[in-house]
A protein has these predicted regions:
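Metal-dependent nucleotidyltransferase catalytic core
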Residues: 1-99
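Generic preference for well-ordered secondary structure
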Residues: 2, 11, 34, 49, ...
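Conserved NTP/Mg2+-binding pocket subregion across the NTase superfamily
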Residues: 3, 7, 63-152
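Sequence-level detector for tyrosine residue identity
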Residues: 8-11, 28, 41, 53, ...
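Generic hydrophobic secondary-structure signal
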Residues: 13-15, 27-29, 48-52, 72-74, ...
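Charge-rich, low-complexity amphipathic helices
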Residues: 37-42, 73, 104, 108-111, ...
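Conserved nucleotidyltransferase catalytic core and NTase-mimicking acidic/glycine-rich helix/loop elements
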Residues: 127-222
Length: 222
């Protein structure tokens, strides 16, 4: 029973501290934290992600700290920082802000920022020019052609470079199709959802690190 409040108390104490700071304009829960009901006695959570808008401060500052086993990941943004992130169509920012949970909002700006973020997110990233797309294709093509002669490399090095270039190819797929590039740890998960056929080709590469299989992925995309 003692666990009831433990997480809620820690959460409440830290969020209250942030809200009561005179410099704070708005506080949001983002990531998986936004769907959690912290008042439940058996709530399970390891980390709490928070966005804070401030009057004065750096454009963006990230502070990580641990309190009673719970990790807080707090991103502070100044007014200028928020404007800049929106005008740069910064993926991580609009993705989180589009459905952030509002905990505090001194100047009633949340609905506007959330609307703008949602629109940017749905429109997708800035479109690349044909020149840029063609450069990506050539650049990656040149990299992987180095791997043609397997015997030139140590086994470990060959595997390492194959994985490295495979990642470049996958990012290239998102770029040339004018899609948002997911974070590294979400790259394969999103790819599987977007294009299962391509995902299957990608997962075959690591079965035997065959050059032809890497080339198949490249040719499928480009």
């Amino acid at each position: 029973q003692k666990m009831i409040g433990c997480i809620y108390e820690v959460y409440n104490e830290e969020i209250t501290k942030i809200i009561e700071n005179q410099n704070t304009l708005a506080v949001y829960l983002v990531g998986s934290s936004k769907d959690v009901d912290f008042t439940l006695y058996d709530v399970e959570i390891n980390d709490i992600d928070v966005f804070v808008f401030v009057k004065e401060g750096e454009k963006q500052e990230r502070i990580l700290f641990k309190k009673k086993g719970i990790e807080f990941d707090v991103n502070y943004f100044s007014k200028d920082g928020v404007k800049k992130l929106l005008s740069n169509r910064e993926y991580f920012f609009v993705k989180e802000m589009k459905d952030a949970k509002v905990l505090f909002d001194r100047e009633n700006i949340s609905h506007i920022i959330k609307d703008i973020s949602r629109n940017i997110y749905l429109e997708g990233p800035s479109k690349m020019s044909l020149e840029e797309k063609s450069f990506i294709k050539q650049d990656i093509g040149a990299k992987i052609s180095n791997l043609k002669n397997k015997e030139k490399f140590d086994v470990f090095e060959y595997h390492f470079l194959t994985n490295l270039y495979l990642k470049d190819i996958i990012i290239g797929y998102f770029n040339i199709n004018d899609k948002w590039v997911p974070k590294d740890k979400k790259l394969l998960k999103v790819l599987k959802k977007e294009n299962n056929e391509l995902f299957e080709l990608v997962s075959k590469v690591s079965e035997n690190y065959d050059y032809q299989r890497l080339l198949d992925v490249y040719n499928y995309i480009f």
